[in-house]
Amino acid sequence: MTRSLKKGPNVADHLLKKIENLNSQGEKRVIVTWSRGSTIVPAMIGHTIAVYNGREHLPIFVTDLMVGHKLGEFSPTRTFRGHAKSDKKSRR
């Protein structure tokens, strides 16, 4: 079930304040955040947001196609190292 339209998007207050301050000053800086559940709103377009994935902050440049998605969708938390290779020498 999707979020009700009357509630509006879920964006962390501290993150929205930082974005609005940078927009009013006309600056573009990397914004560091741990808020993976925040929804990307049109005010964030053009900013680079470093989202925490549990180990490091991954910089994400926000484009207009990302609006409506969550920040956590663009910083994967798991590293896939490939499936186990079949070792034919140990089978003999």
UniProtKB/Swiss-Prot annotation:
Its BP terms in the Gene Ontology are: ribosomal small subunit assembly; translation
The terms describing its cellular component in GO are: chloroplast; mitochondrial small ribosomal subunit
What SUPFAM superfamilies does the record point to? Ribosomal protein S19 (SSF54570)
Keyword list, A-Z: Chloroplast, Plastid, Ribonucleoprotein, Ribosomal protein, RNA-binding, rRNA-binding
For this chain, one GO molecular function annotation is:
rRNA binding
Cross-referenced PROSITE patterns, in alphabetical order?
Answer: RIBOSOMAL_S19
Subcellular compartments: Plastid, Chloroplast
What is the superkingdom listed in this entry's lineage? Eukaryota
Query: Gene3D superfamilies in the record, alphabetically?
Result: 30s Ribosomal Protein S19, Chain A
Whether Glycoprotein counts among this entry's keywords is no
Per the annotation, which location comes first and is thus the protein's main one?
A: plastid
Function text = Protein S19 forms a complex with S13 that binds strongly to the 16S ribosomal RNA.
Q: Which family does it belong to?
A: Belongs to the universal ribosomal protein uS19 family.
Query: Under which name does UniProt file this protein?
Result: Small ribosomal subunit protein uS19c
